[in-house]
Amino acid sequence: MTQNIDQNEVNKFAEIADNWWDPTGDFKPLHVINPLRANYIDQKLSVEGLKVLDVGCGGGLLAEALDAKGAQVTAIDVTEANIGVAELHAKKMQVNIDYRLITAEELVAKEREAFDVVACLEVIEHVPDQESLSKHVLIFLYQMVKCFFLL
């Protein structure tokens, strides 16, 4: 399987990965909008106890917010530095999130795991084959649940 990865995007995020949890840094806009996004998802679905997949999790901002609302979160990203930052922050905050360095396509091929909710926020514009990402994200869903894409 060809990896659906834009190496320039991976390199860009690797360079600034240490800034994920700085609310005044490169990711300030995400820090501002993240509580709104997490609350919106929770209001629509009541995520407590649900299995949530966060595709393109970055440093774990959304993953931790949904974990705090009681979701069982698996979060994936293709940038090793992002996963490292996310894991360190989760350990510091004593939260239990399953972070994985893998693409959505690879996760489907390896595990065929199902999730109640899939969040793919600010990700699709960073991949070369957007249709492939969309198709593979939808494979994870149980019937009659929601998927959130945000460009």
Where are the predicted features?
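N-terminal, positively charged/glycine-rich alpha-helical extensions of SAM-dependent methyltransferases
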Residues: 1-21
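Soluble or luminal CAZymes and related metallo-dependent hydrolases
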Residues: 5, 33, 37, 129
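Flexible, glycine- and charge-enriched loops at secondary-structure boundaries
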Residues: 6, 27, 31, 76
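Generic alpha-helical secondary structure signal
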Residues: 7-11, 28, 39, 81
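A short secondary-structure junction motif
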Residues: 20-23, 48
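Conserved SAM-binding loop and adjacent beta-strand
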Residues: 22-41
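Conserved SAM-binding loop
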Residues: 38-45, 50-151
